[in-house]
């Protein structure tokens, strides 16, 4: 079966002198792998589009037995030269790519994650986002995948949580409780500023995040609590210089 679809290339590599393997995020099928036979020399079929940090329109098929995908041709949609020429920006984008490669995405959420990734690349290309930017991306991916706590009200009594008092985040249940309803046995106490920040990330996109400047304590608390949240619900944890499935 042949498909024509828009993708973002995550990673490429050689497996023969002129042939490449390509890992990409499809807007409809999630993370995919395919072979581009003659990809390193065929300008007619793949001219300038088989590089990471590229948005590409691919025509794909399969081999005769249907055991693997074959890229038949591609055309560049957007190349992100600003990312490729800046090591810091490249690192921010690569961090987001590594998370996408490691996370198991729900099929129904592929389009939302694809749109989120392309918007994230646009922002990194055009602006100079904070080093914390990939965390916002990871949190938003988790929310788009359905792991979407309500950071605004207590799950027990329904009381709004946006006072100055700390709240309790039950990571396993994906719920927040006010201090009055917390039984003291489950959950992690977080500041109201952290709860407001995570609620804001839920409701906004990458173009809004570039203006966010967080105090150091809220930054660290957001990182700590969302790292554990994604480890529990998505099975992915940051370790060393990459992500590990658990």
From Swiss-Prot:
It holds the Pfam family RecO_N. Transmembrane segments: none annotated. Keywords: DNA damage, DNA recombination, DNA repair. The keyword DNA damage applies. GO terms for cellular component: bacterial nucleoid. SUPFAM superfamilies: ArfGap/RecO-like zinc finger, Nucleic acid-binding proteins. It comes from the Bacteria. GO terms for biological process: DNA recombination; double-strand break repair. InterPro entries: ARFGAP/RecO, DNA_rep/recomb_RecO_N, NA-bd_OB-fold, RecO, RecO_C. Gene3D superfamilies: Nucleic acid-binding proteins, Recombination protein O, C-terminal domain, Recombination protein O, zinc-binding domain. Belongs to the RecO family. NCBIfam families: reco (TIGR00613). Involved in DNA repair and RecF pathway recombination. PANTHER family: DNA REPAIR PROTEIN RECO. This is DNA repair protein RecO.
């Amino acid at each position: 079966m042949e498909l024509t679809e828009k993708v973002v290339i995550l990673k490429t590599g050689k497996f023969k002198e002129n042939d490449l393997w390509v890992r990409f995020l499809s807007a409809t099928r999630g993370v995919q792998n395919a072979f581009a036979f003659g990809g390193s020399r065929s300008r007619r079929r793949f001219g300038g589009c088989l590089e990471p940090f590229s948005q590409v329109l691919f025509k794909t098929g399969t081999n005769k037995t249907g055991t693997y995908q074959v890229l038949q041709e591609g055309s560049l949609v957007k190349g992100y030269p600003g990312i490729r020429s800046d090591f810091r920006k490249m690192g921010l984008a690569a961090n987001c790519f590594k998370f996408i490669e490691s996370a198991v995405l729900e099929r129904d959420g592929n389009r939302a994650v694809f749109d989120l990734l392309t918007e994230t690349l646009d922002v990194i290309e055009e602006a100079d986002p904070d080093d914390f930017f990939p965390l916002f991306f990871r949190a938003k991916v988790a929310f788009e995948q359905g792991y979407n706590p309500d950071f605004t009200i207590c799950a027990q009594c329904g009381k709004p949580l946006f006072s100055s008092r700390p709240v309790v985040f039950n990571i396993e249940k994906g719920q927040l409780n006010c201090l009055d309803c917390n039984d003291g046995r489950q959950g992690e106490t977080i500041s109201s500023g952290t709860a407001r920040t995570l609620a804001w990330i839920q409701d906004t996109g990458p173009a809004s995040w570039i203006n966010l400047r967080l105090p150091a304590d809220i930054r660290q608390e957001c990182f700590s609590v969302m790292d554990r949240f994604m480890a529990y619900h998505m099975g992915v944890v940051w370790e060393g210089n990459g992500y590990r499935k658990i």
